[in-house]
Structures are given as C-alpha cells and as structure tokens.
Amino acid sequence: MSRTAEKPFETVENSIVGQSTAINRGEQLTHAIELQELAGSVFKSTMMVGFELSLNTFAAVQANTFANLHHLSEFLGAKSPSQVFDLQCSFLRKRIDMGVEQVKESQALSTKALIDMSKPIKEFFEKAIADLKTA
C-alpha cells in the first residue's frame, strides 16, 4: 500500500486527441439525431399509410355490403325464374367490376404508400453518400 501512495498521479495532456474525440462524438451525435428524425418520419408515414389502407378497406367492405343487401332485396322481389337468373347475372357482373376497381384502388394506394415510406430513407442515404464523397 505504501507504494501506491508514494507515486503521484501523472496527468497526460494531449489536446490533439481530446479535440479529435470531441469531433468524433459531435459527429456521432449529429448522426444519431439524423437517424432519430429518420425513424420518426418513417414511423409517421407508416402510420398514415396504415390509416389510409384501413379507410380504403372499410370503404370497400361497406360498398360490398350495400351491394349485397340491394341484390338481396331485388332477389326477394323477383317474380319469375328468368328474372332471378337476370338478377344473378347482373349482380355477378357488377361484383366482378367492383372487385377489379377495388383491387386497382388498393394497388395504387399501396404503390403510393411504398413511395411515401421509402422517400425519407432514400433522402437519408443520398445525404450519407454525398457526405462520404465530400469526406
């Protein structure tokens, strides 16, 4: 124990190492803030996309339900088998057209959603590549 008490502590001052460490930490902090902003924007756009897709799905379910109920009321009011057959054929044709339109709307919305969600990530990587080229 007496040995450690006899040796005084030596302070090493190296201002170059201290400055470079501070610069590295500053860069790391800047990158961490940028990543946090990226995560926030991706989360926000994902949430909005989910909301839009849900609204689209609910609208499709509502339209399908109304079409089914309308068909049922017409079906119950049919007077002859030929009228029932005509109602079934027209209903089937309308349902196929509705289905095709709903698929097109969902596909367009999904494509828009993917573009919106990937936009912040693309901008972040473009900025990172530009920073690497300048460094």
From Swiss-Prot:
It comes from the Bacteria. InterPro entries: Phasin (IPR018968). Keywords: Plasmid. This is Uncharacterized protein y4wP.
